[in-house]
């Protein structure tokens, strides 16, 4: 299993263009590729901070004609490591993004985190890079 790795996380979105704009303009990702499947009526967009060969990416799936999805209570969040969580949140807010939990240490711990909401309501956790490798330590 040494060659196994996570390739992508798929999120269903109601407005693909709006979601691509959020992940590129607000979160600083690049649109890596986009393709349509006319037979099954969906469009996929893959976004990330680097080439897919270098790490996991986000797959946005737009099912034609579906504007909203029931997210249920099982989904938690996507986590992204950032170099300066405070500056990153300032940049996200300046670009029109919604920070739902301001940056700061986890209650009872020292790891600095923040949360951001994407246009479809998916939560994104930001973790200070120097602490990201250790997880949420106390």
Curated annotation (Swiss-Prot):
Residues where substrate binds: 12, 63, 77
Cofactor: Ni(2+)
Pfam families recorded: Glyoxalase
Organism: Vibrio cholerae serotype O1 (strain ATCC 39315 / El Tor Inaba N16961)
Annotated Gene Ontology cellular component terms: cytoplasm
Keyword Membrane assigned: no
Protein name: Probable lactoylglutathione lyase
EC number: 4.4.1.5
Family annotation (CDD domains): GlxI_Ni
Amino acids binding Ni(2+): 8, 59, 77, 125
Protein family membership: Belongs to the glyoxalase I family.
Molecular function per GO: lactoylglutathione lyase activity; metal ion binding
Protein's job: Catalyzes the conversion of hemimercaptal, formed from methylglyoxal and glutathione, to S-lactoylglutathione.
Pathway given in the UniProt record: Secondary metabolite metabolism; methylglyoxal degradation; (R)-lactate from methylglyoxal: step 1/2
Reaction catalyzed: (R)-S-lactoylglutathione = methylglyoxal + glutathione
Domain (VOC): residue spans on this chain: 5-129
Residue positions of the active site: 125 (proton donor/acceptor)
